[in-house]
Amino acid sequence: MAIKKYKPYTPSMRGRVLASDFFDLSEKKAPKRLSFGIKSISGRNNQGKITCRHKGGGHKRKYRLVDFKRCKTGVLAKVSDIYYDPNRSAHIALLNYLDGEKSYIISPNLLKVGTYVVSGKEASPDIGNALPLNCVPLGFEIHNIELIHGKGGQVARAAGTSAKLIAKSQDYVTIKLPSGEIRLFRGECYATIGKVGNIDHNNEKIGKAGRNRWLGIRPTVRGSAMNAVDHPHGGGEGRSPIGRSQPSTPWGRPALGIKTRRNKFSNFYILRRRK
């Protein structure tokens, strides 16, 4: 995979950088029953309040039904196509099962069209196969890892990410996550072998503000540029200091350097915090 740069024939193209595998994706029509339209909620909750800032607008999207559970065990599936998914940074692969069923999975790196994948305890540890964690050999890269057995993969699903299985015990396995955190997982939880594809996604450059708006990302305004009524850093004459002992969030909580992770029962499974 390589990076594609553009000649600077406009100011926006000067800084634009894309991953070249974007142009190698399938242009065939995708199965209609594996996608449906969704309404953009622009970062609002059911009360209309903003719960996630800087969201709104953007291109219309259809949500693709991705199989994170891989619960169809023992049935071979052929990789027929690899598609772009606007809802995530990774690409998705279309599987045609031998019994006629079709589904999407997150496309691992180096997964080729025409290869066969399978899930189950007896599956070999090849790229794209899904196995219980206690059946994965030590040192293998894995992604789409379940936190709760049967719930579906929740960990290491972004483009270019992978975790590494570093130890096993009777009921648990020890995994090093992409963040550097070392954590225990139940051995019966499923994971997929390999690293998530589109590995050059983090090297892409947007190039212009308008492309961020296509993605539904609105501008981020500095607190010091606001009025005092809008932000703790706002107000004053000219470029004033923030007037506080430390930076604050828009809601007055301490920012920058304060640990915000809540204490949960699952902290028991964390052997070493992320770096």
Swiss-Prot record:
Keyword Ribonucleoprotein listed: yes
Pfam families, per the entry: Ribosomal_L2, Ribosomal_L2_C
GO biological process, one term: cytoplasmic translation
Subcellular localization: Plastid, Chloroplast
InterPro entries in the cross-refs: NA-bd_OB-fold, Rib_uL2_dom2, Ribosomal_uL2, Ribosomal_uL2_bac/org-type, Ribosomal_uL2_C, Ribosomal_uL2_CS, Ribosomal_uL2_dom3, Ribosomal_uL2_RNA-bd_dom
Record text on subunit structure and interactions: Part of the 50S ribosomal subunit.
Protein name in the entry: Large ribosomal subunit protein uL2c
Organism (species): Cyanidium caldarium (Red alga)
Gene name tied to this protein: rpl2
